[in-house]
């Protein structure tokens, strides 16, 4: 796959990511509208918000990109949540989306959650190819740090 194809693939994955997040929210809305949200879902959503805040505090806007291609001149961040997992924003999205799926509890929402998981896995895989090319220390960092879940994966 050449660079242009990777750029198009990255853009497609971003569109899929946001499309699936919208689908998840719409499918979960009838339950959320009635405030029938369990404490487990509240905890997962709060965890997602806290992880996003922590990530943005450590990796300031301007250093990262919504597209999986890293910004030119961006620095490799390995502290804060990045010391635990390589893709904390993706983990936060999955955790927040999990809260929606748990709340709605139907097959369609869980299918959308699994689809989002696959999209974010593909996006992170593509991003890591670019990170390896752009940051000499990324290979070692990748060996030492899990992708989405500390100590697990």
Model-derived segments and spans:
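Membrane-anchoring alpha-helices and their flanking helix-loop junctions
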Residues: 1-79, 91-153
